[in-house]
C-alpha cells in the first residue's frame, strides 16, 4: 500500500502541466484564426499556420483535404458575416503541443463549424500544423 502511494506521488510530481500563461498564449494564437474568419481575410491565419499545414473536413458534404491554402481561399472569398460568433477552448496543452477547439456560428451567415487545431510550439511561438473540422449537419447546403 505504501509503495503504491509513493508511486502515485512520484507520478504527480512529474506531471508536466503547462503554466497558465501558456494557455493564454495558445488562446491568443488561436484568435488569429478567429479574426481571419470573422473579417474574411486570411492575413491573420497566415501568421498562425505553417506553410506545410494541412486541413481535413467536409464543407457542404464535399471533402476538403490537403494544403491549408484551401482554407485561405474559403476565408478570403466568404466574409464571416454579421452574425458570426466564435469560442476558443484550449482542450489539451503540454510543453510543445496544444489542441484547440473553435466553435463557430454563422460563418457566411449560414454555416456552423467545430474546428480542431493542432498547434506546436516552434521557436518559442505557437504555430498551427493541422486543422480538422466538422460542419454542423443542419447547416449543410444540399
Predicted segments with their positions:
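Short, low-complexity N-terminal intrinsically disordered segments enriched in polar/charged residues
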Residues: 2-43, 47-51, 139-141
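Surface-exposed, charged secondary-structure patches
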Residues: 21-25, 54-60, 65-112
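Generic alpha-helical hydrophobic packing signal
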Residues: 23-26, 32-33, 96-98, 118, ...
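Residue-level detector of alpha-helical recognition elements and their boundaries
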Residues: 41, 48, 59-61, 115, ...
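Short, hydrophobic secondary-structure boundary micro-motifs
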Residues: 46-47, 56-58, 129
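Short beta-strand segments enriched in hydrophobic/aromatic residues
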Residues: 49, 104-106, 132-133
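Short beta-strand edge/turn micro-motifs at domain boundaries
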Residues: 112-142
Amino acid at each position: 500500500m505504501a509503495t503504491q502511494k509513493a508511486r502515485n506521488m512520484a507520478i504527480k510530481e512529474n506531471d508536466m502541466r503547462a503554466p497558465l500563461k501558456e494557455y493564454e498564449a495558445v488562446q491568443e494564437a488561436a484568435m488569429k484564426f478567429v479574426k481571419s474568419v470573422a473579417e474574411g481575410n486570411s492575413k491573420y491565419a497566415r501568421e498562425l499556420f505553417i506553410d506545410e499545414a494541412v486541413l481535413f473536413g467536409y464543407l457542404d458534404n464535399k471533402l476538403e483535404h490537403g494544403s491549408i491554402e484551401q482554407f485561405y481561399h474559403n476565408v478570403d472569398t466568404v466574409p464571416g458575416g454579421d452574425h458570426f460568433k466564435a469560442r476558443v477552448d484550449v482542450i489539451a496543452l503540454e510543453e510543445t503541443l496544444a489542441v484547440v477547439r473553435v466553435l463557430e456560428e454563422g460563418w457566411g451567415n449560414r454555416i456552423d463549424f467545430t474546428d480542431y487545431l493542432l498547434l506546436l510550439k516552434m521557436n518559442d511561438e505557437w504555430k498551427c500544423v493541422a486543422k480538422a473540422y466538422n460542419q454542423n449537419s443542419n447547416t449543410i447546403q444540399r
